[in-house]
Amino acid sequence: METYTLRSGAKIPAFGLGTWKSKKGEVEKAVKEALKIGYKHLDCAAIYSNETEVGQALASYAGPRHELWVTSKLWNSAHQPEDVRPALERTLLDLRLTHLDLYLIHWPIHFTAGVVFPRSADQFLPPDAIPVEETWQALEECVQAGLTTHIGVSNFTAQKIDALMRTASIMPAINQIELHPYLQQDAMLNYGREKGILLTAYAPLGSGDRPKIMKKAEEPVLLQNKTIIETAKKHKATPGQVLIAWALARGTVVIPKSVNPKRLRENFKAQQIKLDQEDMAHISALDLEWRFVDGENFCTADSTYTLDWLWNE
C-alpha cells in the first residue's frame, strides 16, 4: 500500500476507509471486512455517531496497532479549550484505543457546548468567540499527553490555516477537504505542498448517498460523467475506481466510504490503476468548483456564519 510521509517523518496510508454515512448495524461489519481485505487507514468522527461500532471492529483486529492509521475529528461543540481533551478521550473510549494517529478540527465553526446541530441562533457562537489558536493549543496538549500523534484541520481555507499557524507550536499535518474532479482545489493543493500540509480528499466519489437535505436540485452526478465512464472503460475499471486512482495520482490521501463488500474490494483494487497524462488532462477539464458538501446547513438565518466566510476567508 502506498504511503505519504508527513513533516514528522511518519507515514500515512494514502488510501483509507471513510465512515461518514455508514449506518449503525452496518459499520462494524464493513470495518471488519475492510481490515480483512487489507485496509490500514480508517477515517472516523464523533459526529458520525458510529465510533462505538468502529471500536468493536478494531477490538477484533488481530494485527498490531502500529500497522493501522486511525483518524477522528473534534466536533463543533467542543472547541472551548477545556472541552477538547474530554472529547478526544470520549472518542478513544468509543474506538477502544489508547491513542489516535490523527485528530482534526472538523469545521471552523463553533456551537455551544453539547449541541449536535443548532436549532436556534443562541446555539451558534460567532467565529471570534473561540480563537482558533486556543483550540489548537488544547490539541497540542493532547499530543504532548500521548492521546494523538498528529493534529490537523478539516474544511479550513488557507487564510484560516495561516491564522492558526501564527501561534502554533505544532503545525497541522493534514487538511481534510472535499476534493474530486468537480472540485479540484488546485490552489489548496499548491498551498499544502508549499506549507508541508497533506490533503485528504473526502467525498471523492461525489457523495451521492448523503442526506437529501444536503442535496440541491439538478446537481451533477460525478459517477455518471462521460469522461469518467470512458476512462473507466479504457482501464477496464469502474468509474469509482477511476476517481480513486485520480485522487492518488495527485498525491492526496483518499478515503472512499462503502459498506458493500464488493465495492470495498473494488475501491481497494483502485490503488493498482495508473492513469496516464492523457487521462489526467481529460479529467482536469472537468472542474466545476462544485461543492456537494458546502456547509450551507451551518449558514442559516439563525447563524452568524456565511458561505463566503466559510470558503473565502
Report the location of each language-model feature:
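CE4/NodB-like, metal-dependent polysaccharide N-deacetylase domain
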Residues: V84-I105, E141-A145
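Active-site mouth loops of central-metabolism enzymes
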Residues: P13-G25, L74-P81, Q123-D128
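Acidic (Asp/Glu)-rich catalytic clusters
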Residues: R7, G55-E67, L92-R96, M165-A168, ...
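A short, structured active-site edge motif that brings together acidic residues
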Residues: R65-A78, L102-P108, Q176-L179
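Short acidic/polar active-site loop segments enriched in Thr and Asp
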Residues: K40, T98-D101, T149, A173
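N-terminal binding-site loop/beta-alpha segment at the start of enzyme catalytic domains
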Residues: M1-L68, R85, Q144, L205-G208, ...
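Short, acidic/polar
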Residues: S22-L35, Q80-L95, E134, Q159-D162
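Beta/alpha (TIM)-barrel catalytic core signal, keyed to glycine-rich beta->alpha loops juxtaposed to Asp/Glu
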Residues: N76, I109-E313
